[in-house]
Amino acid sequence: GHQKVLTQAKRKAKKDKLPFGVITFEPVPVMFFNSKLKNHRINSLIKKKKQLQRLKIDFLVIIKFDKDFSLITAENFIKKIIFNKLRSKYLFVSKNFRFGRRRIGNIKTLKKNEKFFNYRTIITPPYKKDTKTISSTLIRKRLSSGKIKEANQLLTRSWCVIGKVLKGKQRGRKIGFPTCNLSLDSYIVPRLGVYSVNISAN
């Protein structure tokens, strides 16, 4: 779903000779509001940056999502970020986009403020595959249930995690081949099982 939004935005920016940029939040808002939600990420911020670089974006705005920012109203978000900071001409969003304090802002809010702040809202329809709407929620379900191949098909790439190798109980010495304990940090944790993976190390 996100990829479709980005693709359409890039095409429009190129056509109108405008800079193409992306706004993202760190940490993920849902994780900020739910401290018990430890494993939710599909991507790390590092991985997200690399993917956006491949799309050749002109700029990336990373907004620190903290208590102060969570209190900003939808109207102030439009005024301070969309208008004052970015001077956006087009906003590409999915139909279920929510923003602002208590997630009150939606498509209607964006549309209502278009003329005053001189921008246009473009709503990207849901991307479907085999009658199923492709979304982050669906991808998380596939990953957490261990259906990595299906998740990769939805992502159109191989799922990747980045983490530190932790010292374990050194059981690899007893089973005849080396092992490593990888910290998944805030990533989705796949179902317990055996998986074939490719590894690169720094």
Predicted segment positions?
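N-terminal catalytic cores of NTP/NDP-binding nucleotidyl/phosphoryl-transfer enzymes
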Residues: G1-N39, S44
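Generic structural signal for well-ordered alpha-helices
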Residues: L6-K10, K49, I78-K79, I107
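A conserved beta-strand->alpha-helix junction
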Residues: I23-P27, L55, F59-D68, P125
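Glycine-rich, highly charged phosphate/nucleotide-binding loops
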Residues: N39-K48, I72-I78
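ATP-dependent adenylation/nucleotidyltransferase module used to activate substrates
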Residues: S44-I46, Q51-D58
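Active-site cores that bind ATP or allylic diphosphates and position pyrophosphate for catalysis
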Residues: I62, D68, E75-K79, F83-N202
